[in-house]
Amino acid sequence: MNESGRTRRQFLKAVGATAAALTIPPAYAARGANALVIDPQPRYELSPYLYMQFMEPLGTTDGSVAAAWDFGRDCWRPDVIDVTRKLAPSMMRWGGCFSSYYRWKEAVGPRDRRIPMHNMCWGGLDTNQVGTVEFIDFCRQVEAEPLMCVNFESDGRKYWEKDPKGSVRSAGPEEAAAWVRYCNDPDDKLRRSHGIEKPCPMRWWQIGNETSYARNAFNCETAAQKTIAFAKAMRQADPDLTLIGWGDSGWAKQMLEIAGEHLQYIAFHHMFNPDRDRDKSPLRDTEYRKDPARTWEHLMNAHKAQEARIRWMLEQVGDDPTPLALTECHFALPGRNRCEVLSSWAAGVANARLLNVHERHGDRLKIATLADFCGTRWQVNAIMIPVPGGRSFMMPVARVMSLYRHHSGEQAVTVQRTPDGLDVTASRTGDRLYLHVVNTNRQRSVSTQLAIDGMALAAGRVFELAGDPEHEIIHAQPNGVTLSEKALPSDGRWTFPAASVSAVELDVPTA
């Protein structure tokens, strides 16, 4: 799939006999300093859910869900749907801190009977005009698997058990089980009384959101025992659920020892500042504009923090085979509008390196994201929604996630050799190889010779995102970073522009 809409057959016809007969020298003939060599043997399955997005009503802090909803027509804004289809998230998660005081029944049924709620974390009142049914409808329209985060007894946070006016906001296993029935039980009376005859299938559920982050809340053992109670109640409503438990802050080992038989995934989050231990970071506030070269250097090293975080989680789970679910993740930098540097293309290139880290750990990491989904202000958003008018557009992180999502294989393969300056991962589906290539040089292109161990190539094409790393994607100029599609030359040589992110598709003979 690609944005030009051309099929593989049309492409091959367009490039003609030259591409069809394309033969790239075998790997042994391309061992120079500029060689990019791939071992095509499959290593492990790559999950499609490495491209998840995360939707949370953020109240007065950021427009998010309220900005994406058309209150006049009681539907999602068409421009939000359109741009999300281009982003093509494989999974969409509803929840976050909001889940700790969310009572789902207030947001279903007739609109004039829905009960507004105090958004205690993010400020203001949420109208609850967007609830379970609307969220599932959004997921259907953009072809994303829905994931719901339950109210896990307010995650043990006393300050969220009641709102300032005394309304009880905590909910237990029975309410979670009723939610499962509302979604999945063909005979659920409440849903049918709302005029919805057929189920709204919801197979993925997370129990606990950042439960370990609060002081004077649940400890790990208490959370694990409550996780079991929730899991049993929810599975009594539907035995075919996929459940994710909370395991961050050193909880993973104990959580899995106590509750692991009830869980399919263990979750953690990573909202991070790679320069948090450094004074005078160029990534804070608007400092990034003063010294672009220094900013670039810091952004290109940010992947190390992501690598360390995932490795730490793998150490926590040890030999337990339960896969990891990174259900929230993004840069968290101080400054106006939350991480302003993230509007720059330089940050897009940095996020591509983080995606490559995810793929390298794809044997254990099976769910991941790199952004909040949508909003009007925060630069950590994947989709920016102009208000009061204008068309929604993809931020740099979304452009990279979209590129990878549309050009990725099902199985990881090994990158044997790369030229200096390139960060490369590779995958495969059948007779097609996919390379994700990041040029980490700010001002220098990198020329390379592509080769595959023991194979020739039938055809190749390159999908390339490139632009000035200092360019900032804002509502007035959302198209400053362009996506181009090009045929790979018959000699297999290619030059990756400075500060570029590319997806390379290589067709290999099956015989």
Regions found by a protein language model. Name each.
Residues 497-501:
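Tight coil/turn sites that cap or link beta-strands
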Residues 32-264, 268-280:
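N-terminal catalytic cores of secreted or lumenal carbohydrate-active enzymes
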Residues 4, 10-29:
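N-terminal export signals
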Residues 421-456, 462, 502-505:
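Carbohydrate-binding surface patches
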Residues 209, 327, 438:
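Active-site flanking residues adjacent to catalytic metal/cofactor-binding acidic residues
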Residues 455-496:
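Acidic, Ser/Thr/Pro-rich beta/coil linker or hinge segments at domain junctions
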Residues 324-400, 412-423:
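Aromatic/acidic polysaccharide-binding cleft in carbohydrate-active enzymes
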Residues 220-352:
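Noncatalytic carbohydrate-binding groove/subsite architecture in carbohydrate-active enzymes
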